[in-house]
Amino acid sequence: MVLPKALGLASICLAVGVAACNPQISGDFYSGDVVDVLETDKPVIVPMRLGMPIQNEKKCEEHKNKMLPALERNSNNVKFLNCEDVQGNMYDLVNVEIDAETVKGMDVGDGQISGMFGARVAKDETNRAEIIFVKTPKAAKAIKEIDALYQFQSIELKGIEIKIRLNNDLRQAAQFVAGSSYVDGRPIDREASFELKRRAFIEVVPSNVRSQSLIANGQSLFGVLLLD
């Protein structure tokens, strides 16, 4: 059965499942940034793409005007990209670019991340560099502000879809340890190590469990970087 997007986002989410209407985050992460943050204690800023589900991209200007002010108040360097007609799905997207900070620290209170999303990196007891994704309270604040502008539907942050391309821009090879994720389209249950030669990259999509941890706990392990 094909459902028209005009049914509205709330009906769409109910019809096809909540996960289908989650915000989407994608972008590039660099092993060199992990090393820089660990060595200098200074944050590194990288642009990330944030896709916010909407009912219909044909009403782009209306959705853009509702969402952008809240995102600008709670994120850094917000740039509107486009409204995307997501073929084959019951929703479309407002795509924006936001700055995401990578800071040094292992605990939730370590390192100041000023936007909605970011990452913390720290060496564990075996000297491995853990990469932890972070959702700050500003994410919930932005969603609440956007929700207040929609009269007949609820905008809630119940899940999030993440897709990251991890690039090795170092002069030497590195190992990335991932678990509970899809790596280059392959489902990885237990921890597995992937070699990243110089200038190589892999695409990592964390599982729903890790995404839900990010929503519920404000943080989720992305993976571990081992350097030669």
Label the predicted regions.
Residues 35-43:
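Edge/loop elements at the starts and ends of beta-strands within beta-rich repeat scaffolds
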Residues 17-20:
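C-terminal motif of bacterial Sec signal peptides marking the signal peptidase cleavage site
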Residues 22-24:
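Bacterial signal peptide processing site
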Residues 43-70:
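Post-signal-peptide N-terminal segment of Sec-exported extracytoplasmic proteins
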